[in-house]
Every structure is written in C-alpha cells, then in structure tokens.
Amino acid sequence: MLKALHFGAGNIGRGFIGYLLNKSGYEVTFVDISKEIVDNINKYKKYNVIILKEPVEKEEVKEVKALHLEEEDKVLDAFLEADMVTTSVGVSNLSSIGGRLKKYLKARKEKNEKPLDIMACENALFATDVLRERVVKEEDDDFITYLNLKVGFPNTAVDRIVPAVKIDKKLPVDVAVEEFFEWDIEKNKIKGNLQIEGVELVDDLKPYIERKLFLLNGAHATTAYLGYLRGYTYIHQAIKDDNIRAIVKGMQEEISTALSKKYDVDKESLMAYAEKVIKRFENPYLQDEVTRVGREPLRKLSSEDRLIAPLKLCSEVGITPNFILYGIAAGLLFDYKEDAQAVKMREYVEQFGIKKAVNVITGLEEESDLVEEIEKRYFELKGKLI
C-alpha cells in the first residue's frame, strides 16, 4: 500500500486532502501540533466526512493514524517510508515545516532511493515553491542534485470549502465539507507514481491557481467583507443580497476579462466557473460565517493575495477596475474585534490615514490612481455605515 504523510490535521487536512488520499488507497499518517487532534485520530483510527448537500451524505475515512509534530523520531520514520508528503498548515507555517523537511530529506537521501513527491496544498500562489526554497537554502550541490533526481515539488491548486459549521459529530474529529472539490497538480514536476482519485494533472498550473485564487477566494472574501458591513452572519445570506451579488459578479467579470487576456483563455469558460462559485456560496448547509471567511484581512489584502493581485492584473492588461475596488474597500472596513489582524488594520488606518494604510497593507503606491480609487470607495462604504 502506498503511504502518505500529511502535515496539518485541521479541517482541510482531514476533510479534503486526507479524505481524498485515503479514498485513493493511500495509508495516511497525519502530523499535527494539536495533541487533542492527534490523540483522537489515534484513539478512533477513523473519522467521518459529512458532505453538506441535499440529502446530507457521510463517508468514513478508515485506518488513519497521527503523530505529534514534536515526535521527531516517529515523524522521521514515517517520512522515510512515505511515497508522498503533503501539507495544509497555512502559508505562514511553510518556512518552519520546510526546515523540518530539510532534515528529513537528508536522512532519506542516505536510506531510501524511492522517489518522493512533496506538495503544499495551501491557499496561495505556488506554495510548494516556497517550501522548496526553504529546503534548498544554503545547501550543497550534492544535496540539490539528490533533490533534482529523486524529489518532486509540484505546485498545486486546491479547492474545497470546509466551513466551521456545527454538525452532529459521532467522533470528535468528524468534519463537514461541501460536495465540490478540485485538486490540480503540476504534471512536469512529479517524480513518483501519483495515484489520487479526482486529481487533474496539468502542464501549466498558473491559470488554474489564479482562476481559483481570484474568482473563488477573491469573490469569497468580497462576499464576506460586504456581508459583514451589511450585518449578515453567513455567506449564503450575504450572496442573496442584490447589491452584494452585483458587486461580486461584477468583480468576477472584471477578473475573467483580465485572465482571458493574460492567458488567451475563453472568457465564457471562466464566467461559467465563476457562476458555479456563486452557486456554491448559496449553499445554506455550509453555514459559513462571514467572520470566518474574512479573517486575517492583512494577509488577504496583501500584495499577491486574492484581491490585490487581480486588481494589479486588471490594471496591467488595460482593464479599468471598479467592482473589485469595493471588495478591497470593504476589507479595509472589516473591524471584527475577535480578529487580531482586523484590530491591527484599524490601528494602521488610525495611525497613518487611509491612503498610507493602503500602501502599508497592500504594497500599492500611496499616490497611485488605484489607491485613490480605493480611498473613494472606502469613504463611500463607510458613509453608508454612519
């Protein structure tokens, strides 16, 4: 049986990556920093994935185990035997995981000649490249030659909404997910024999990553931020608001036009994808809170993330953005007190004023036309709150 080692046993790890690997016949071992999650996985050796649709379905993920991140020797042993290593730890944790992988790979180089594929399954552009850069940093030619020959670092685009919805759990590690999923992998960087059900192997991943990051994640964040300002609790409520829906669809059209120009892709196929995204947001079973989707606004409004990157793309290909600016402005007004980044963002605005704050948060030039347009929408939306 093929063996997979997955770092990050959170909802995405269990409800998407681990679920799909297990379904594809892999023996899955999770690695996590949460003792509670690790202990529960090992206690029950299984969990249920509840698929939120009509009627609700349940699938059992069996014969799984878990290790605590600090169980170094056991994690190393599992790594030495693995055919595939995946992560869903959050982009900010990739550097520290990369440092650990470097140690494990050096040990594997001496003990196992089998090829290995390592994939970062994160909500970010080319996250596996980030992981690989950490692994190869300041390394000698011999180690890098080994990596080039035996270790694949394919980038991925992953997509499945895993909301923090309250469900009737039979086991503490049960997880609820939407029915839809997508997992695209760079074909030309694979070294081993990947056998994952439902995965698409692609020659050029960038259009897939940007389509997902901009048209799904960007639209999701826009719905959340506007929904928060209008007092909605859930995404499915917000997307039914005619004003919010018009802005979200408008920003998707702007982005689809830009992506079709950049990649010479049919705009209609991009708009069909965007329409599917809207339907997913409408699913009332997800009970997806706007505060969950909007969390960490400093990250979501950063230079290469879901809102600023497509804004810059529109500008680069000659499209005058309008609707996308409302999502950014609404994000800047996300003042949820339970979110440390939202609190920090308010401090930036109070300390610097809006234009300088936008520059600090997004990296956009303070005196640029784009920042001026964001400022206009910021005060337009803020005025409606008073």
From Swiss-Prot:
Any one Gene Ontology BP term: mannitol catabolic process
GO cellular component term of the entry, any: cytosol
Binding-site list for NAD(+): A4, L5, H6, F7, G8, A9, G10, N11, I12, G13, R14, G15
UniProt EC number: 1.1.1.17
Database matches in SUPFAM superfamilies: 6-phosphogluconate dehydrogenase C-terminal domain-like, NAD(P)-binding Rossmann-fold domains
GO MF terms, alphabetically ordered: mannitol-1-phosphate 5-dehydrogenase activity
Pfam families with a match to the protein in the record: Mannitol_dh, Mannitol_dh_C
InterPro entries: 6-PGluconate_DH-like_C_sf, 6PGD_dom2, Mannitol_1_phos_5_DH, Mannitol_DH, Mannitol_DH_C, Mannitol_DH_CS, Mannitol_DH_N, NAD(P)-bd_dom_sf
Entry keywords, A to Z: NAD, Oxidoreductase
Classification via Gene3D superfamilies: N-(1-d-carboxylethyl)-l-norvaline Dehydrogenase, domain 2 (1.10.1040.10), NAD(P)-binding Rossmann-like Domain (3.40.50.720)
Catalysis: reaction(s): D-mannitol 1-phosphate + NAD(+) = beta-D-fructose 6-phosphate + NADH + H(+)
Keyword Protein biosynthesis: no
Keyword match Transcription: no
Stated family: Belongs to the mannitol dehydrogenase family.
PANTHER family per record: ALTRONATE OXIDOREDUCTASE-RELATED (PTHR30524:SF0), MANNITOL-1-PHOSPHATE 5-DEHYDROGENASE (PTHR30524)
Classification via NCBIfam families: PRK02318.1-2, PRK02318.2-5, PRK02318.2-6
HAMAP family reported in the protein's UniProt record: Mannitol_dehydrog (MF_00196)
Name of this protein: Mannitol-1-phosphate 5-dehydrogenase
Biological source species: Caldanaerobacter subterraneus subsp. tengcongensis (strain DSM 15242 / JCM 11007 / NBRC 100824 / MB4) (Thermoanaerobacter tengcongensis)
